[in-house]
Swiss-Prot record:
Compartments, as annotated in UniProt: Cytoplasm
Keywords attached to this entry: Aminoacyl-tRNA synthetase, ATP-binding, Cytoplasm, Ligase, Nucleotide-binding, Protein biosynthesis
Protein name in UniProt: Arginine--tRNA ligase
Catalytic activity annotation: tRNA(Arg) + L-arginine + ATP = L-arginyl-tRNA(Arg) + AMP + diphosphate
UniProt keyword Ligase present: yes
Broad class of the protein's primary localization: cytoplasm
GO biological process: arginyl-tRNA aminoacylation
Length: 606
């Protein structure tokens, strides 16, 4: 039983004894005492005024007096401010609470059981015509952290990815490679496969624009105005016509085109795997659009037969969503080709066949809000049980400060380049501050990797996902303030203290003995540690990993003040020294768990 539960039981007894009334536990409202008042927990007295038939101040005084007299092991002091009773919890209660946190190897984490709900989380969703970029970084980090948070709340979690591996954009890279590649491979070029294919996507665009420019001038010379000439040039570009023909052949299962498609996509997947590994994200199941788009068509036709959808004169299939306050939505074009919505329905069908899904969460940018509103309704109409409860984990754009780390094209920042730059910056900053002194080259490189990637991940994850954000590389690697490196350094500092204690032969017992006089700072730290359980729960119910990130920062900020104000290893009172070591060890444990949920490593030394 935790402190709040014990206190609630004592307050119920107080009301019964003082006012002769039985009250349910939910009527007892306890909250953290505001910093300007003395105490740890505050009871809201107003619900009991009808029972006491007295004013709020007097009622608070009576309940406080009863608790101090009849539960001195729980309440050591109290003060009343209007209708609020501020209660100071006895020191031994805090030690007991610390012991319970220490006894739990994974405090705050709820394990899934056989009967736990299954949550599927889709994130990443790359195209196979280019490398992952800065936008994917935010998506991957959010998806991975959210999966960890949902698992920590006792859910079975399946992490899934849908790869956009078909369509005209893929054919553009394929065609450019055939025309200009001279058989170049990742091995011959020394490039990652995704970067190599990305180069050919850019090459297609360059040649296509030059072709359109030339044709536009030709059509203008023949008497068309600029707008008409450009439209005709785009429609008649030989390069684009070839790309469309290649797509037609792909859809007709042309063996040569399919073999080329497979070869080039395999290069890209090998590149993606390296990026994902460096980023520390993984998937339990990967779906490919080339396998799902036909399934979607089938499901739409099934919905048409059942009268959920209707067909227009041009043979296209639509959903009428006006009853739901939306408009009419295209599901199949007149020529039978699918749209994104069809593909999402197909992917949903396959997933539902593969897993007994209770909740489906899509981690996709906020520009797709309407799309997922529609998808939820369509899936529900088609009989997918989780359709109505579908969650679109919508997030805002992420940008870089102007002029920072632009790629050669000057528009997109590759994830690989960004991570490499972060590790390099971490190495320079750490070396300047002496944080790599005395380490081998291998150890220093590993610290730079942990700090660089930790800085990137934390800076992105501390921001509420719904907000647009600017990622500032230099600011993120600051060892002071609300940053990953500040939290990592505090963890390493704690491990250093614990190593020194072990070298001095000091052993932290499994149970810290009672009878110590604790400071308000020490009690406050234990209270913060205990809060971790509710922080994890809130992050899960709100789908908000930033709650955990900011909790970790608040915790290490408090610990650093404690570290500054109190002696640990130099404390003369042995019992107090051991208590402070135990407190430090448990702060380290919770910091490591919290950062782990965000996908961030913490170094044992720095």
């Amino acid at each position: 039983m935790n402190i709040e539960e014990k206190l609630t039981t004592s307050i119920i007894s107080a009301i019964k004894t003082l006012y002769g009334q039985d009250v349910p536990g939910k009527m007892v409202q306890l909250q953290k005492t505001k910093k300007e008042f003395e105490g740890h927990l505050t009871l809201v007295v107003f619900p009991f005024l009808k029972m006491s038939k007295k004013g709020p101040e007097q009622t608070a005084q009576e309940i406080g007096g009863y608790l101090k007299e009849h539960a001195p092991e729980l309440v050591s002091a109290y003060n009343a401010v209007k209708g609020f009773l501020n209660l100071t919890i006895a020191s031994d209660c805090w030690i007991e609470l610390l012991n319970s946190i220490q006894a739990a190897p994974e405090y705050g984490i709820e394990k899934a059981t056989e009967n736990s709900p299954l949550v599927m989380i889709e994130y990443s969703s790359p195209n196979t015509n280019k490398p992952l970029h800065l936008g994917h970084v935010r998506n991957n980090l959010l998806g991975n952290a959210l999966a960890n948070v949902m698992a920590a709340n006792g859910n079975k979690v399946v992490k899934t990815n849908i790869v956009n591996d078909r369509g005209i954009h893929i054919c553009k890279s394929m065609l450019a490679w055939l025309k200009y590649g001279n058989g170049e491979t990742p091995e011959s070029s020394g490039k990652k496969g995704d970067h190599l294919i990305g180069d050919y996507y850019v090459a297609f665009d360059k040649h296509y624009k030059a072709e359109v420019k030339e044709l536009t001038a030709q059509y203008q010379a023949e008497g068309l105005n600029e707008e008409e000439a450009k439209a005709k040039a785009e429609a008649n570009s030989p390069l684009m016509l070839e790309a469309r023909e290649m797509l037609r052949k792909w859809e007709a299962n042309d063996p040569e085109i399919r073999a080329l498609w497979k070869k080039m996509n395999d290069w890209v997947y090998a590149g993606f795997d390296e990026t994902y590994k460096m980023m520390g994200v993984s998937f339990d199941k990967i779906y490919y659009e080339s396998n799902t788009y036909l399934e979607g068509k089938e499901k739409v036709m099934e919905g048409l037969e059942k009268g959920f959808f209707y067909r227009k004169e041009d043979n296209s299939v639509w959903a009428d969503l006006t009853a739901e306050g939306l408009d009419h939505k295209l599901l199949l074009r007149g020529d039978g080709t699918s749209v994104y919505m069809t593909q999402d329905i197909g992917t949903a069908k396959l997933r539902f066949q593969d897993y007994p899904i209770n909740k489906m969460i899509y981690v996709v940018g906020n520009e797709q809000n309407y799309h997922f509103q529609v998808l939820s309704i369509l899936l529900d109409k088609l009989g997918f049980e989780w359709g109505k409860g579908l969650v679109h984990f919508s997030y805002g754009m992420v940008e870089l400060p102007e002029g920072k780390m632009k790629s050669r094209e000057g528009t997109v920042v590759d994830a690989d380049d960004l991570m490499e730059a972060m590790i390099e910056t971490a190495k320079e900053t750490s070396a300047e501050l002496g944080k790599l002194d005395g380490l081998t080259q291998e150890e220093a490189d590993n610290i730079a990797r942990i700090v660089g990637l930790g800085a990137l991940k934390y800076f992105i994850l501390k921001v509420d996902a719904r907000k647009n954000m600017t990622f500032n590389p230099k600011e993120s690697i600051d060892f002071n303030g609300n940053t990953g490196p500040f939290i990592q350094y505090t963890y390493a500092r704690i491990q250093s203290v614990l190593r020194k204690a072990a070298e001095a032969g000091i052993v932290i017992p499994e149970i810290i003995p009672a009878g110590l006089e604790l400071s308000a700072k020490e009690e406050g730290l234990i209270q913060m540690l205990a809060d971790f359980k509710s922080v994890v729960k809130q992050a899960g119910s709100d789908y908000n990993p930033s709650i955990i990130a900011n909790y970790a920062y608040d915790l290490v900020k408090e610990y650093n003040q404690f570290y500054h104000d109190f002696s640990i290893l130099r404390e003369e009172n042995e019992a107090l020294k051991v208590f402070r070591l135990a407190l430090s060890a448990n702060v380290g444990k919770i910091v490591k768990t919290a950062m782990g949920l965000l996908g961030i490593e913490v170094p044992e030394r720095m």
